[in-house]
A protein has these predicted regions:
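Conserved beta-strand hairpin/beta-sheet module of binuclear metal-dependent hydrolase folds
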Residues: 2-61, 149-152, 156-160, 253
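FMN-binding flavodoxin-like domain, especially the glycine-rich phosphate-binding loop
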Residues: 170-210, 214-217, 259-275, 285-383
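Active-site neighborhood of phospho(di)ester-bond hydrolases with catalytic His/Asp-centered motifs
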Residues: 44-46, 68-76, 96-99, 158-162, ...
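Active-site metal-binding motif and surrounding structural segment of the metallo-beta-lactamase
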Residues: 39, 50-97
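Structural motif
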Residues: 40-42, 70, 132, 156-159, ...
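Active-site-proximal loop/helix segment associated with metal-binding centers of metalloenzymes
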Residues: 143, 147, 163-190, 233-238
C-alpha cells in the first residue's frame, strides 16, 4: 500500500533470467503498477505479458467490485505496456491516457491506436480524479521518446516511469544503489542530458514519494536518490578510485595488471578494482567504469586489432557517452603491439578524457622495462 487511496498492484518476476535480453538478474525483476482510487479510478501502467492474469486479479481484488476509468501508460516498453489490450477487454468503458508518440507505438505493437478510447496528454496537461490530480511531465528519451511522468499533487507522489528503477524483485531485500546503478548505466546511461533536464523539472516539485516502474517505492531520504541520479547523469565520478579492465590470453597481461594493482595500493590509491572482461558480467564492469574516477585498459593486440572482449567493453562505454575520467593503457604483443593505439582511437569520440602520460608496453611477458613503466603509471594515477 502506498497510501489509503493509492495501492500497489504490480508483480514480481522470478522466471526471467535476462532483462532486455542481456542483463543478468539473479534476483528477478519487479514490474510495478499502481491504482489511484477516487471518484475516478486510474490504473498506472500494466505489467509484462507473462503476468496478465495475476495483474488483472490484483486490480479486481484491490478495487472490490469497482471498475477503473483510466489506464495511464507512462512508457511503452512491453514489460509495462503488454497488457493494454487485456485491460481494455476486461474494462470496456475505460480509457487509455498517454502521449501522442505512445499511441503511435500502440498502433505498431497492437495494430490499433485505440482512437475511440484514448486521451492524449502532453507536458502541463492534468487529469482530475477527484481529490487527486495527475500533472503530466514530458520525459523524452528517459529512455524512450514517448515517455511521460505524472505528479499527483494531493499526495505529492511522482510516478517516475523507468527513472529511479532498479533490477531485482521486491520480495528480496538488497541494497538499492548497486542494482539501481547497474540498471541506470546499462539502460538509461546514454541519455544523461535528457535525465538532467528531467531532474530540473523534478526538483521543482514538492515530492514526498517516488513510484518507479521497477524497484521499491521510495519514501525516505529522497535527496539521496536525486543526488545519485544527478551524479550519474552528469557523468561525474561517484568515487575516487582506479578500475582496471583487462583481457589476458596466456596470463602475461594478467600478471602486469596484478602488479599494477599492487603498486596502486602501495602508493595509497583509495580504491582499486580489477575486472577480467572474459569472466565478469559485462554490465557490472561497465557500471564500475562509470563509478570510479580512473580507468586502466589492459589488453593484447589480436588479429591486428584488440581482443574481442575489450572491443565490446569500449563499445559499451562509448555508446553510453563515457566522459570526465582519466584513462590509462597497458598493451601486450609479441611482434607488433598496437592495442594502445587502437583503444585510444576508439575513445576519441568521448568527451573530456584525460589520457595518462605513462603507458605500459609488454613484449610477450613482463620485463625490467615494462615493470618500470608499471611503477611510473601507478605513481601517476595515485597523484
Amino acid at each position: 500500500m502506498i497510501s489509503e487511496n493509492i495501492k500497489y498492484i504490480g508483480v514480481n518476476d522470478h522466471i526471467i533470467d535476462l532483462f532486455e535480453g542481456q542483463y543478468i538478474v539473479p534476483n528477478g525483476m519487479a514490474y510495478n503498477s499502481y491504482v489511484i482510487i477516487d471518484k475516478k479510478i486510474a490504473v498506472m501502467d500494466s505489467v509484462d505479458q507473462k503476468f496478465t492474469e495475476e495483474w488483472l486479479s490484483n486490480i479486481e481484488k484491490t478495487l472490490h467490485g469497482k471498475t477503473p476509468d483510466y489506464l495511464v501508460v507512462h512508457h511503452m516498453e512491453p514489460d509495462h505496456s503488454a497488457n493494454i489490450v487485456s485491460f481494455l477487454n476486461a474494462y470496456p468503458n475505460a480509457f487509455v491516457v498517454s502521449s501522442d508518440k505512445a499511441f503511435k507505438m500502440m498502433a505498431q505493437f497492437f495494430g490499433t491506436d485505440f482512437a475511440d478510447r484514448r486521451i492524449v496528454v502532453k507536458e502541463g496537461d492534468t487529469l482530475n480524479l477527484g481529490k487527486h490530480t495527475l500533472n503530466f511531465i514530458a520525459a523524452p528519451m528517459v529512455h524512450w521518446p514517448e515517455v511521460i511522468l505524472s505528479y499527483e499533487s494531493n499526495e505529492k507522489i511522482l510516478f517516475s516511469a523507468d527513472a529511479f528503477g532498479k533490477f531485482g524483485a521486491l520480495d528480496i531485500a538488497e541494497d538499492w544503489a548497486c542494482e539501481a546503478r547497474r540498471y541506470y548505466i546499462g539502460i538509461v546511461g546514454k541519455y544523461g542530458t535528457q535525465v538532467q533536464a528531467l531532474l530540473k523539472k523534478a526538483t521543482a516539485l514538492d515530492i514526498k514519494t517516488i513510484c518507479p516502474l521497477h524497484g521499491p517505492v521510495l519514501t525516505e531520504n529522497l535527496e539521496y536518490y536525486l543526488d545519485l541520479y544527478n551524479t550519474w547523469s552528469s557523468y561525474t565520478p561517484e568515487e575516487e578510485g582506479v578500475m582496471i579492465a583487462y583481457t589476458s590470453i596466456y596470463g602475461n597481461t594478467k600478471k602486469a595488471v596484478m602488479l599494477l594493482a599492487e603498486k596502486l595500493k602501495e602508493n595509497g590509491c583509495p580504491k582499486v578494482v580489477v575486472n577480467d572482461l572474459a569472466r565478469e558480467d559485462m554490465a557490472e564492469v561497465v557500471e564500475d567504469a562509470f563509478r570510479y574516477s580512473k580507468l586502466v585498459l589492459a589488453t593484447t593486440t589480436y588479429n591486428a586489432d584488440i581482443f574481442p572482449f575489450m572491443k565490446e567493453f569500449i563499445d559499451h562505454l562509448t555508446e553510453r557517452n563515457f566522459q570526465n575520467r582519466t584513462v590509462a593503457f597497458i598493451e601486450n604483443g609479441s611482434w607488433a603491439p598496437t592495442a594502445t593505439k587502437v583503444m585510444q582511437a576508439m575513445l576519441e569520440k568521448c568527451k573530456n578524457l584525460t589520457l595518462s602520460e605513462n603507458t605500459v608496453k609488454i613484449l610477450s611477458a613482463l620485463s625490467y622495462e615494462s615493470e618500470a613503466q608499471i611503477d611510473n603509471l601507478a605513481k601517476e594515477l595515485c597523484k
